[in-house]
């Protein structure tokens, strides 16, 4: 989330303190890598916006899947390696047998975007000149085709330059799309539309590792944030749908517990529990059961107000007009 300069120092100090455990001090790179599971690494970017976005890199024999791409805005611009692609191709990792994740870019990239916000798409330009293809929701592909990406991504609000993207290297996929490699071999990754945080949001199910990549649908330790097109009612319905889906998977005999890998701050959590708790928290905010902690001017809506709510590990920064819409909605807010 971009903030007003007057608030920057307090917000920066708070964010640095809350996320210090995610970042290793380095004289080489703005990324910190840890192994998430047998096939996947989590990269955390030390960015100047203090978003600390999480990028996931899943390794296959035929390709490298990258889920989100971070900000491409290093907090320390003097570091030798601040490009996501360069990190993946050149920085050796102890947890990867002292090899880079994709040495010299030998394998093609399949890039999956959870949604359009600047802290998830900023690293896309680093992949130009390499073999890559981008997969996103159909809604996001429409946003790009209609020349709304600079606005809807918040890059305009954050005074960031427009991204230059090759539309021929992008595919907007339907809900439930199964990803395959260049030889039409299933990668056991399913892409699901998941609106709420933003209208173009999607999540990724890794059926091999029983991991759900949630983007900004749910996480702990930092406020869930809503900007253009956010919808609390849709968000609750999305969380309920995902909770039901994963619960169904887990009821199969011998099935593993699903793990959540989030876009910020949280990974390795019990996915069903996180979805349940987030859904209940948002519903309780709408119903007035969680008091507003503070209010400030909404940087994305003239005359609007952002309200802040917290409970236990969860928090929310929500425009007041979205709360009014949800409280006045005739749609059932909780389907379970």
Swiss-Prot record:
Q: Give the GO biological process terms.
A: secondary metabolite biosynthetic process
Q: List the disulfide bonds.
A: none
Q: In which pathway does it act?
A: Secondary metabolite biosynthesis
Superkingdom classification of source: Eukaryota
According to its UniProt record, where is this protein located?
A: Nucleus
Q: Which InterPro entries would you find in this protein's record?
A: Metallo-B-lactamas (IPR001279), NDM-1-like (IPR050855), RibonucZ/Hydroxyglut_hydro (IPR036866)
Entry protein name? Putative transcription factor avaE
Give me the positions annotated for DNA binding: 32-100
Question: Where are the bilayer-spanning segments?
Answer: none
Under SUPFAM superfamilies, the record lists: Metallo-hydrolase/oxidoreductase (SSF56281)
A Pfam family per the record: Lactamase_B
Its biological purpose: Putative transcription factor; part of the cluster that mediates the biosynthesis of a highly modified cyclo-arginine-tryptophan dipeptide (cRW).
Q: What is the lineage of its organism?
A: Eukaryota, Fungi, Dikarya, Ascomycota, Pezizomycotina
Q: Which UniProt keywords apply?
A: DNA-binding, Nucleus, Transcription, Transcription regulation
**Cellular component, GO, one term:** nucleus
Q: Output the Gene Ontology terms for molecular function.
A: DNA binding
């Amino acid at each position: 989330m971009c903030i007003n300069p007057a608030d920057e120092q307090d917000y920066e100090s708070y964010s640095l303190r809350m996320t210090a455990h995610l970042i290793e001090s380095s004289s080489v790179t703005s990324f910190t890598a840890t192994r998430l599971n047998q096939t996947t690494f989590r990269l955390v970017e030390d960015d100047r916006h203090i978003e600390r976005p999480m990028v996931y890199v899943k390794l296959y024999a035929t390709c490298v899947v990258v889920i989100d791409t971070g900000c491409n805005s290093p907090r320390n611009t003097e570091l030798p390696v601040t490009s996501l692609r360069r990190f993946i191709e050149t920085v050796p990792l102890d947890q990867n047998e002292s090899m880079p994740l994709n040495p010299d870019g030998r394998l093609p990239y399949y890039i999956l975007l959870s949604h359009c916000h600047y802290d998830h798409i900023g690293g896309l330009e680093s992949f130009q000149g390499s073999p890559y293809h981008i997969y996103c929701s159909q809604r996001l592909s429409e946003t790009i085709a209609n020349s709304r990406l600079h606005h809807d991504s918040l890059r305009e609000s954050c005074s960031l330059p427009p991204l230059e993207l090759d539309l021929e290297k992008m595919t907007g996929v339907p809900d439930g799309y199964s990803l395959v490699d260049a030889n039409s071999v299933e990668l056991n990754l399913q892409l699901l539309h998941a609106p709420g945080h933003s209208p173009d949001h999607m999540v990724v199910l890794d059926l091999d590792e029983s991991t759900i990549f949630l983007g900004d649908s749910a996480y702990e330790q930092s406020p869930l944030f809503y900007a253009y097109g956010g919808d609390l009612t849709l968000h609750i319905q999305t969380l309920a749908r995902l909770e039901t889906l994963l619960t169904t998977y887990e009821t199969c005999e011998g099935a593993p517990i699903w793990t959540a890998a989030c876009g910020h701050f949280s990974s390795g959590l019990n996915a069903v529990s996180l979805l349940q708790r987030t859904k209940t928290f948002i519903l309780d905010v709408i119903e007035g059961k969680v008091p507003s902690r503070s209010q400030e001017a909404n940087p994305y809506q003239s005359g609007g107000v952002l309200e802040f709510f917290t409970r236990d590990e969860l928090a929310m920064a929500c425009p007041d007009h979205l709360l009014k819409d949800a409280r006045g909605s005739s749609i059932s807010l909780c389907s379970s």
